[in-house]
Every structure is written in C-alpha cells, then in structure tokens.
C-alpha cells in the first residue's frame, strides 16, 4: 500500500473515532482569559499556573531592562550556536547559578525544553549494563528517553510501589546501576507520586532517583521548588528536572544535580550538544520569572485551595475527578462525551479542551482543567455550576 493511501486511511480512522487533531489558533491573552475564534474565553487549558505570563509589574520591570540593553548580550534575540561553540552567554550561567543556589545544589544545567532534557539525560547516564525503572504514566518524553537509551527498562504499574520494589529486588546484583524515574505531579490524572516511599526504595536498593517536576515547580513548596521541596526530600533526589514552560511562563527546562553529573552531561548529552542554544533574551526572562516565583507562596496556597474546592464541588455533583493537585481531570468516558462537554463549555465562555486516547487509556476521555492562581473563587464556583447544568 502506498504511504499516501495508508496515511489517508489512518486519518479517516481518527476522524471516525473523534480523535483527529488540528492546531487551534489562539489570540491575545488577558490575565486568565484567552481569545479563541474571536471570543474571549476563561482559559482552563494553560500551564501558566501562577499567572506569571501576564503579570504586568514583572513584565514592565523586565521590559525596562531590555530597553536599557546589556553589553553582555543578555537580550540578544538568538544564540545562533550550540552552547559548546558560541551560544553560551553569561546570562545562562547566571540562571543556572540562581537555580542551583535556590535548591542548595552543586550545579544546574539549562536545556532547550523538557523534551530535550528527558530524551537526553537517561541515554547519556545509562549504559547497556544498567536498568531503568519508570512509572507507567510518565510523560512521553521520558518514554522516548527510555527507547533511545541502551539500558534495559521496565515500566512499573502507576504509583504501585510494591510492584516497583519487586522489580528492584529481582534486579539486585544484576546491573551496574538501577535508575528510578518518576514525575512528581502526573499531568493527566493530577495525582502525586509518593516521593518519600521512592526515596526509601532508592536508599534500600542503591538506586539512582530522577524526578521530573514539570508540573510541580512553582506550585509546591514554600519557595515553589516543587513537590520534593514540599515533602522535604530535595537532598535525596539525584537529578531533579524542572521546566520554564509551565508555571514559570517562559521556555526551556533545567536539571539540578551534582557538579560531576553536570560536567559529564556537557560532554555526552546529544540533546544539549547538537542543538542551537536558547536565545539569551529568553534566558533573561526565565531568570526574572524564576526569581519572582520564589516569593509567590500566597499564590500557591490560593491555587491549591481553588483546586480542592472545584474537585470537591464536582465530586459531590457526581463527576469523577481523580487526583489531588492543581490539575483537575474530569473523566467522562467516551470520546464523544468529552468532545461534547468541551464544546458546550466553549459556548458558555470556557476554554477547556478534551483529552482522548491514546493520550489517556481507552474509555477515560476527559477534560483536563488546569487552574491558575489568578482565578477567583467566584469563577471556580461558576464553572462548577455550569458543568452541573450541562450534565443534567
């Protein structure tokens, strides 16, 4: 069968299942609102958890610095090179130093994206003599990192730490190094990893623990350093991965680690070496947002309070709302049910996108409500009331 015919059939199959994706065009943002199709909707599908992307004072302060310029090239629009050539600007070092200091770590390393981090770190650190144990619901970028790495890998049942321990016990003495990889906040179910249990297992079996805090940074911990900070286990994490593209309202990612690991990754990590570095201007903005979020304890508390309120209200109304984080999934089952609810909410003034298989398991299509700290209690209550009326 010619490739064009195969693709056409696959597209028809996706359309028949209501799983055909397109790139929706969005317009201006105004606080928690987004313009879509000429209408201003309350945005419940963004990862800008703290609202930093539209904080006027922060943006004005940063823009004033941009207008003054910088002799060290910190506001250049492009790096035009890999970091190992001519793309390693001083502002990148400032950002990494600020991150390492905040975490009390020896070193930090900035990457172009969380995808670059997760597809590069494991293949660099592991060999064919190693084993990687990964939570089954880890992000696609982690899964791709597993596939690229030469090490063997197993995926333990989601949050089933008894299963993980069985795998650790059976691997004892058979590998040079065992790695445990988990997210802290799982983005589709909104649940949290038991990091204290994972630290205990890491210590007992001599494993290396890597935690992806993509959805935890900015939201958890007194200084927004993530769930590891909130649970007091930071010093027990071998590598912590964070992202600038969510609560920090920028682009790129970082990893916190020992100086030894950092030096090794600089020399071996293909997704760091063989790519053009981030523009210095974006590194400068990331430094501004990272510094600002360290002080946003009140916003974090408000955000988590909103999530608890919405989850309880919808749960009392008969909706299935698993998890316990600022990400509130509303599981509706069939694909068409999720698509219909999203369309009805759009008519009511809300931008809440459906998530369907294969992103989530079959018969668990859902709305993934991503809450923001700049939402008001009244807006959350109105959303819950609207969803109840649409269901009845």
Curated annotation (Swiss-Prot):
Pathway(s) per entry: Cofactor biosynthesis; biotin biosynthesis
Cofactors (names): pyridoxal 5'-phosphate
PANTHER family noted in UniProt: 8-AMINO-7-OXONONANOATE SYNTHASE (PTHR13693:SF100), CLASS II AMINOTRANSFERASE/8-AMINO-7-OXONONANOATE SYNTHASE (PTHR13693)
Quaternary organization: Homodimer.
Family as reported in the entry's similarity comment: Belongs to the class-II pyridoxal-phosphate-dependent aminotransferase family. BioF subfamily.
A family per Pfam: Aminotran_1_2
Protein name: 8-amino-7-oxononanoate synthase
EC class name: transferase
Organism lineage string: Bacteria, Pseudomonadati, Chlorobiota, Chlorobiia, Chlorobiales
SUPFAM superfamilies registered for this protein in UniProt: PLP-dependent transferases
Gene Ontology terms for molecular function: 8-amino-7-oxononanoate synthase activity; pyridoxal phosphate binding
Free-text function comment from the UniProt entry: Catalyzes the decarboxylative condensation of pimeloyl-[acyl-carrier protein] and L-alanine to produce 8-amino-7-oxononanoate (AON), [acyl-carrier protein], and carbon dioxide.
Gene3D superfamilies per record: Aspartate Aminotransferase, domain 1 (3.90.1150.10), Type I PLP-dependent aspartate aminotransferase-like (Major domain) (3.40.640.10)
Residue positions binding pyridoxal 5'-phosphate: 114-115, 187, 212-215, 243-246
Organism whose genome encodes this protein: Chlorobaculum parvum (strain DSM 263 / NCIMB 8327)
Catalytic activity: 6-carboxyhexanoyl-[ACP] + L-alanine + H(+) = (8S)-8-amino-7-oxononanoate + holo-[ACP] + CO2
Location of N6-(pyridoxal phosphate)lysine modifications: 246
Record bears the keyword Cell cycle: no
Keyword annotations of the record: Acyltransferase, Biotin biosynthesis, Pyridoxal phosphate, Transferase
GO terms classed as biological process: biotin biosynthetic process
Binding positions for substrate per the UniProt entry: 21, 139, 359
Coiled coil: none
EC number: 2.3.1.47
Keyword flag Acyltransferase: yes
């Amino acid at each position: 069968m010619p490739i064009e015919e195969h693709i056409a059939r696959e597209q028809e199959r996706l359309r028949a299942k209501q799983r055909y994706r397109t790139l929706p065009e969005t317009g201006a943002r105004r606080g928690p609102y987004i313009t879509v199709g000429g209408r201003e909707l309350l945005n419940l599908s963004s990862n800008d958890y703290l609202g930093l992307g539209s904080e006027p004072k922060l943006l004005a302060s940063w823009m004033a610095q941009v207008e003054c310029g910088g002799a060290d090239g910190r506001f250049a629009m492009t790096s035009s090179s890999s970091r190992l050539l001519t793309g390693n600007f001083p502002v990148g070092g400032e950002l990494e130093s600020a991150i390492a200091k905040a975490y009390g770590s020896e070193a930090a390393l900035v990457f172009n994206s969380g995808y670059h981090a997760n597809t590069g770190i494991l293949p660099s650190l592991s060999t064919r003599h190693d084993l990687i144990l990964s939570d089954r619901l880890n992000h696609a970028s982690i899964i791709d990192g597993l596939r690229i790495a030469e090490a063997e890998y197993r995926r333990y049942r989601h949050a089933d730490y008894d299963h993980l321990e069985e795998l650790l016990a059976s691997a004892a003495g058979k590998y040079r190094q065992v790695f445990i990889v988990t997210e802290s906040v799982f983005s589709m179910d909104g649940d949290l990893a038991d990091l204290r249990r994972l630290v205990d297992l890491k210590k007992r079996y001599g494993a290396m623990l890597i935690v992806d805090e993509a959805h935890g940074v900015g939201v958890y911990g007194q200084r927004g350093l993530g769930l590891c900070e909130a649970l007091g286990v930071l010093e027990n994490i071998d590598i912590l991965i964070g992202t600038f593209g969510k609560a920090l309202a920028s682009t790129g990612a970082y990893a916190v680690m020992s100086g030894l690991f950092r030096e090794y990754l600089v020399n071996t990590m293909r997704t760091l070496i063989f790519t053009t570095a981030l523009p210095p201007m974006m590194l400068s903005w990331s430094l501004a947002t990272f510094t600002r979020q360290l002080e946003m304890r009140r916003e974090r508390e408000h955000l988590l309070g909103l999530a608890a309120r919405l989850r309880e209200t919808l749960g009392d109304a008969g909706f299935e709302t698993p998890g316990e984080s600022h990400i509130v999934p509303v599981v509706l089952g069939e694909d068409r049910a999720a698509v219909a609810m999203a369309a009805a909410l759009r008519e009511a003034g809300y931008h809440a996108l459906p998530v369907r298989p294969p992103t989530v398991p079959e018969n668990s299509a859902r709305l993934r409500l991503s809450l923001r700290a700049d939402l008001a209690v009244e807006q959350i209550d109105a959303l819950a009331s609207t969803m109840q009326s649409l269901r009845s």
